[in-house]
Amino acid sequence: MSETATWQPSASIPNLLKRAAIMAEIRRFFADRGVLEVETPCMSQATVTDIHLFPFETRFVGPGHSQGINLYLMTSPEYHMKRLLAAGCGPVFQLCRSFRNEEMGRHHNPEFTMLEWYRPHYDMYRLMNEVDDLLQQVLDCQPAESLSYQQAFQGHLEIDPLSADKTQLREAVAKLDLSNIADTEEDRDTLLQLLLTMGVEPHIGKEKPTFIYHFPASQASLAQISTEDHRVAERFEVYYKGIELANGFHELTDAREQQQRFEQDNRKRAARGLPQQPIDQNLLDALAAGLPDCSGVALGVDRLVMLALGAESLADVIAFTVDRA
């Protein structure tokens, strides 16, 4: 294919056929388990407050709205799906487009396909088992292994992430030849994320998927804090062959605590010179009305297909990447 023929798809037709078969297999997986497929909006008047996520923004100027309404493309269907859960829909899954105004590369595209599902009355470990079942079915891989966040850091970096201070974290980063970044970084969680990305991820999930669970409580996001150890959150991620595939939570159901976390995110955004984001009041109202105890997970479908096909990059499994869109 000529590099100038940008009308052509980035992925080959045989790969797109295989992708379609995997999408059908995912739907069968959930149909066999009685999980309802749902569709939720791609746009919302509120968005995520996470300091590491950057949403696309647009403006609706249709009849009756001459002043316009700010809308955000969804970085994940999470908030709308939780509103469905609070309304009593039971276990749900969704295959949808998500959007993040961030990088483009081998493992990233600003528009991507997300698989997200929620299981009422599942704890984190039971959902991890279901994720493992799906990966074995789609990837024909070995059963996954699991490490706590603390075990992963102690094993690969010889540091305890739950007790180390910022000086110790900077010293650990310096051993990875990244002191030029760490020397000016004041946020503890950013240092931990740097260590996870550069010092842990390259060493895990090589032969089989690896779950990392019990992230620090400061990185809980929308997850519950563990009742057994208040230093950690009921949150997990799964990695395979150098790729982060999924991020899951035992979901927070306390509306007041969730609002406090959103507000704290916005304070962090302001301190970094980032725009503060509108908080999703509809989500908070749904939590207040009663979100059932549940666990949920978001999985990158394009990355899953890439692994299933042994492809080198997302461009090999997406019909049109952003540079050809």
Curated annotation (Swiss-Prot):
Substrate binds at S76, P77, E78, Y118, E251. It is an enzyme of class 6 (ligase). The keyword Translocase does not apply. Pfam families: tRNA-synt_2. Keywords: ATP-binding, Ligase, Nucleotide-binding. It catalyses: D-beta-lysine + L-lysyl-[protein] + ATP = N(6)-((3R)-3,6-diaminohexanoyl)-L-lysyl-[protein] + AMP + diphosphate + H(+). One of its GO terms (molecular function) is lysine-tRNA ligase activity. Its EC number is 6.3.2.-. ATP binds at R100, N101, E102, N109, E244, L245, G300. GO terms for biological process: lysyl-tRNA aminoacylation. InterPro entries: Aa-tRNA-synt_II, aa-tRNA-synth_II, aa-tRNA-synth_II/BPL/LPL, EpmA, Lys-tRNA-synth_II_C. Belongs to the class-II aminoacyl-tRNA synthetase family. EpmA subfamily. This is Elongation factor P--(R)-beta-lysine ligase.
